[in-house]
A protein has these predicted regions:
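Tandem CBS (Cystathionine beta-synthase) repeat/Bateman regulatory domains
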Residues: 1-145
Length: 145
C-alpha cells in the first residue's frame, strides 16, 4: 500500500487544489471581543479558527478551549469577561502555516498534529486553509485506484 503511494504522483499535487479559500473560512479579526469569537466558533461548528487583521494578514488562532480557559474563575465561568477581553488577549500566535507553493508532502507532515493548516501567499496574506480531512480524502482516492 505504501509502495502504491510512493509510485503515484500524489506528492506532486499542489496544495492550492485542496485549499478552502479564505472567503469560505470562518475567522475573526483582531479587536473582536471574545463573545463574538465564541459565537463564530459555535455557529461554524469548528473548534478553532484563524485570527486576521483588516488586511487579511494572519496573526494567530482562537479556539473554544482558549476562550473557556480565559473566563474560568475559581468557582464558575466568569461570562462577563467575554465582552471585556479581546481575541488578541487569548489567541495562540504560534500556529501552523505554509506558503501556497509548499509541497504536498510538507502539508501532509504538518497535518499529523494539526486539524488544519493556514495557507499564506508570498505577501504573508491569508488565502485559505488546508484541512487534514482533505489531505486524507486525497490519499484515500489514490489508494482506491
Amino acid at each position: 500500500m505504501l509502495q502504491k503511494l510512493k509510485n503515484s504522483n500524489i506528492m506532486d499535487n499542489e496544495i492550492k487544489e485542496l485549499m478552502i479559500s479564505a472567503d469560505k473560512v470562518a475567522h475573526v479579526q483582531l479587536g473582536n471581543p471574545l463573545e463574538h469569537a465564541l459565537l463564530v466558533l459555535i455557529k461554524s461548528g469548528y473548534s478553532a479558527i484563524p485570527v486576521l487583521d483588516s488586511s487579511y494578514k494572519l496573526h494567530g488562532q482562537i479556539s473554544k478551549a482558549l476562550i473557556l480557559d480565559s473566563i474560568l474563575g475559581l468557582e464558575r465561568f466568569e461570562l462577563e469577561r467575554l465582552n471585556e477581553q479581546r481575541v488578541e488577549d487569548v489567541m495562540e500566535e504560534k500556529i501552523p502555516w505554509i506558503n501556497k507553493n509548499s509541497t504536498f508532502s510538507r502539508a501532509l507532515a504538518m497535518s499529523i498534529n494539526h486539524p488544519f493548516i493556514c495557507i499564506l501567499d508570498d505577501d504573508r496574506s491569508f488565502i485559505g486553509i488546508l484541512t487534514r480531512r482533505s489531505i486524507l480524502a486525497l490519499i484515500n482516492r489514490y489508494l482506491q485506484k
